[in-house]
């Protein structure tokens, strides 16, 4: 049985650890609320762009944008969104496992993969497995910087337009609620005809073709022309989806970290209680032994 001093040292150590995890839990809770606000704030913009783009495409059915064209899949681009830091439960493990399974499917079909990494954890994974990396962004902080995101993703969009890839996927963690985060592997390009929002529907692929019904019966007047307007709207729509993927992952990260730190704090409290019980028993045994020795010594005298 360990001595009293050793047990007291262990209790002090666990108490210090609990203070750290409790502080991290509170910080994560604060960041989680802000991340959720940013995530939800981006949805109205994406919804309106999607709605307008769908209306314009219905009004101009003769124009088939490259983002809508179906091709034979020979190569794909994958944007892997992970965190820069750990201590967030199984968040990165789950999305990494899903991504590796999809990579195996691509390999079985002899489909090449060109990847973009957002976050240190994803970058490390792609580097270890030898995936061709075309762009990367790490140390994104607590608030996604749109300029940095678009700089990294432009490589993939250019590859798609120039035919180097035939589809573009994003692997991220969809925020469901504070206690649940769902790893998803979503197809961004080619776009489905209905331009559905994957982060609201929770679908693994953008296969749904639900059409947006227009309430407007008049013709549009375009400046400079219909093609330019649709091109710009679809570009912004895809960029909005990618921003949303990163925002969803950040909200999921803070939620998972808060839950993980709360579990760590609770476990530390339990360990402290168990150590305190052992300490009390050890101290009681030592006192009893000392009393017995004193009584025995007095009797001998």
Swiss-Prot record:
Disulfide bond among keywords: no
GO molecular function, one term: ATP binding
Subcellular location: Cell inner membrane
CC terms in the record's Gene Ontology section: plasma membrane; proton-transporting ATP synthase complex
Domain of life according to the entry: Bacteria
CDD domains reported for this sequence: F1-ATPase_gamma (cd12151)
This protein's UniProt keywords: ATP synthesis, Cell inner membrane, Cell membrane, CF(1), Hydrogen ion transport, Ion transport, Membrane, Transport
Membrane topology of this protein: Peripheral membrane protein
PROSITE patterns cross-referenced by the UniProt entry: ATPASE_GAMMA (PS00153)
One GO term of the biological process aspect: proton motive force-driven plasma membrane ATP synthesis
Membership in a protein family: Belongs to the ATPase gamma chain family.
Subunit annotation: F-type ATPases have 2 components, CF(1) - the catalytic core - and CF(0) - the membrane proton channel. CF(1) has five subunits: alpha(3), beta(3), gamma(1), delta(1), epsilon(1). CF(0) has three main subunits: a, b and c.
Protein purpose: Produces ATP from ADP in the presence of a proton gradient across the membrane. The gamma chain is believed to be important in regulating ATPase activity and the flow of protons through the CF(0) complex.
Protein's name according to its UniProt entry: ATP synthase gamma chain
Organism: Bordetella avium (strain 197N)
Gene encoding the protein: atpG
